[in-house]
Amino acid sequence: MAGTVVLDDVELREAQRDYLDFLDDEEDQGIYQSKVRELISDNQYRLIVNVNDLRRKNEKRANRLLNNAFEELVAFQRALKDFVASIDATYAKQYEEFYVGLEGSFGSKHVSPRTLTSCFLSCVVCVEGIVTKCSLVRPKVVRSVHYCPATKKTIERRYSDLTTLVAFPSSSVYPTKDEENNPLETEYGLSVYKDHQTITIQEMPEKAPAGQLPRSVDVILDDDLVDKAKPGDRVQVVGTYRCLPGKKGGYTSGTFRTVLIACNVKQMSKDAQPSFSAEDIAKIKKFSKTRSKDIFDQLAKSLAPSIHGHDYVKKAILCLLLGGVERDLENGSHIRGDINILLIGDPSVAKSQLLRYVLCTAPRAIPTTGRGSSGVGLTAAVTTDQETGERRLEAGAMVLADRGVVCIDEFDKMSDMDRTAIHEVMEQGRVTIAKAGIHARLNARCSVLAAANPVYGRYDQYKTPMENIGLQDSLLSRFDLLFIMLDQMDPEQDREISDHVLRMHRYRAPGEQDGDAMPLGSAVDILATDDPNFSQEDQQDTQIYEKHDNLLHGTKKKKEKMVSAAFMKKYIHVAKIIKPVLTQESATYIAEEYSRLRSQDSMSSDTARTSPVTARTLETLIRLATAHAKARMSKTVDLQDAEEAVELVQYAYFKKVLEKEKKRKKRSEDESETEDEEEKSQEDQEQKRKRRKTRQPDAKDGDSYDPYDFSDTEEEMPQVHTPKTADSQETKESQKVELSESRLKAFKVALLDVFREAHAQSIGMNRLTESINRDSEEPFSSVEIQAALSKMQDDNQVMVSEGIIFLI
């Protein structure tokens, strides 16, 4: 192998002696002697050695170990076995081999799967990434013992391949006959096997360069290292990089498959923990005490400061980042603590921007889109291993985001089958797979933040929210909060938004060059290296508030302070650790408010309800109140936390969209009435007021509107009277003509006959006049027809619009 130096026996013994001197450090600090004694007492056979210690004691040997791993590791492991034998000879005989695992600083050999190139072959490297695939654990034969009944002899054979540290692999043929063709029987009790597993680690998604796919590398785990990692874990793997020749038909191709033979697997913290100093903790405590009254509002305002408005949505996202308290009850049931939020609304209301902010702020977040995600891609897939042909599990986005946040954009574009796949994850926090002979359960305890557009592209305010949303109740009830974000035309608000957006475009970060594109991620691939001499004094001081900038924050908000993003991350990280307990007062209040929500749900119409009020809503109230208490750094959930949670739920569940629409219509009616005052007499005004008085009780009714019911006087009826067309003005003028009861009754009968003959729900004015007067002895004049239609319109029996009569 290129770059490999084969040690002769003399050099091997010298290396073994050096490593033995390193381990026998009783005269020094006695670190490794105590570690070996612990290894014996714990019945282990792998010793973890810090490379930095070896480098300080014998730099030459440390460099050789990193650059010529196979021979040096063999010498190191022999030295370890000799050292164990010197302490406990009987224990050393229990195991055939003792293993050495490495940790510490690897310098240029600390790489990611992308930078793992051919120059690292036969070297010890430290690779970090995220586990995407795991094979099943299989036993692999190390030594087989065979008995020949004919000759009464026992044959022993050892096996080694390129996945071991032995330089020359042995034949892998399993003997069935001896030299004289006598059959052999395998003595399974005397044979030795080791556990064998293959995993694939992939470059971390946030560290992959822009425009390039994440790379991956196969890792071989043996003995005690198997099952150290599962799909979704972030790990550091220290091992030897080796290439395996691929033989096809007796020939070896010029390209080789490479693997990493692991000697140590270290779990990285699933949360990208910010480094804390003592000053940071003191600042967090001081901030929570000084701003105890309005701390929740202060933090919510500082979330996504580049987005104007959406105060309630920001409060909900802050609750999502903090989370509730998860509970595993004695009877085996699990109550989730993660908060799920769905944002539904018109285009261009900053839904996707809010998702992107969460991606940057949350300690662990995975982005996906509805169209680019399948059900198995979100949960877990069973794939076939190309080499062995066996089935294995591959983790999906929600498993990879365990204890984090999954942001799903364009949620409405997903197919129904894919959406149903995430039902179990959103409530139980796990993925259960029972496919192709594999039955597995993976943890996926993640919060879901989803954004979707309404069914019709834009939100139709004349349809119920359930019709606009178009998702199943079973899915909606799993979302704790559902926000309808509307793009409403309000001149004052539009002016504020335009001012805010223009300031954002004029703002330039310090040091930004002319014409330079802002980087989306970190330009440098930051790898986590353990530094034993790390001191926190080198840390930069974290500022609580951002420095005020007129362009960035606006001139009107000089008094408002924005919490800096760095401090926000640290504050959320500390606040998540707290587990507040419900007080009796808050528990009683939540129970009362829940029963009120249920009764409000049954009394009010469907138009006001955005998602079903179920028993999950009660858990939602508890989770939101707990998150609010976490924001205050409180150990108890008090009444103010419960009140804030109820306010959020009231806003999200019962957003009275149609009421706002009615106010706008009323305003437009008032404006049109002021114009009519100049043109019409006082008598017309009084009649209009009378008609509006008879109309007002109708608007208060909460039931849905049925266009085929004569007696129906529902809340959508104001829509009938809104347009001020020429026909409606003629109708008001024609009200001066009084019709007798008999004449009106005759008109109604004739009108119904005309509609019956036409087999239609609408008919034109000219056709109506012609049909009514065709067989009538006393024809109706146009003024009489207008007066009769006006009377029937007031009684909600017909609707006249642009010369067409609609039967209601």
Curated annotation (Swiss-Prot):
UniProt xrefs under CDD domains: MCM3
Listed Basic and acidic residues bias regions: 727-739
Region Disordered, residue ranges: 662-739
Biased composition (Acidic residues): 670-681, 704-717
Effect of S535A: 50% reduction in phosphorylation by ATM or ATR
Chain positions recorded as ADP binding sites: Q353, L393, E394, A395, A397
GO molecular function, one term: ATP hydrolysis activity
Gene Ontology terms: cellular component: alpha DNA polymerase:primase complex; chromosome, telomeric region; CMG complex; MCM complex; membrane; nucleoplasm; nucleus; perinuclear region of cytoplasm
E.C. designation(s): 3.6.4.12
GO biological process terms held by the UniProt record: DNA replication initiation; DNA strand elongation involved in DNA replication; double-strand break repair via break-induced replication; mitotic DNA replication initiation; regulation of DNA-templated DNA replication initiation
Subcellular location, record wording: Nucleus; Chromosome
One Pfam family linked to the record: WH_MCM3_C
Residues carrying Phosphothreonine: T674, T713, T722, T725
Keywords for this protein: Acetylation, ATP-binding, Cell cycle, Chromosome, DNA replication, DNA-binding, Glycoprotein, Helicase, Hydrolase, Nucleotide-binding, Nucleus, Phosphoprotein
Residues making up the signal peptide according to the UniProt record: none
Residue list for modification N6-acetyllysine: K293, K547
Motif (Arginine finger): 477-480
Subunit relationships: Component of the MCM2-7 complex. The complex forms a toroidal hexameric ring with the proposed subunit order MCM2-MCM6-MCM4-MCM7-MCM3-MCM5. Component of the CMG helicase complex, a hexameric ring of related MCM2-7 subunits stabilized by CDC45 and the tetrameric GINS complex. Associated with the replication-specific DNA polymerase alpha. Interacts with MCMBP. Interacts with ANKRD17. Interacts with MCM3AP isoform MCM3AP; this interaction leads to MCM3 acetylation.
Note: Early fractionation of eukaryotic MCM proteins yielded a variety of dimeric, trimeric and tetrameric complexes with unclear biological significance. The MCM2-7 hexamer is the proposed physiological active complex.
Protein name in UniProt: DNA replication licensing factor MCM3
Organism classification: Eukaryota, Metazoa, Chordata, Craniata, Vertebrata
Gene name per UniProt: MCM3
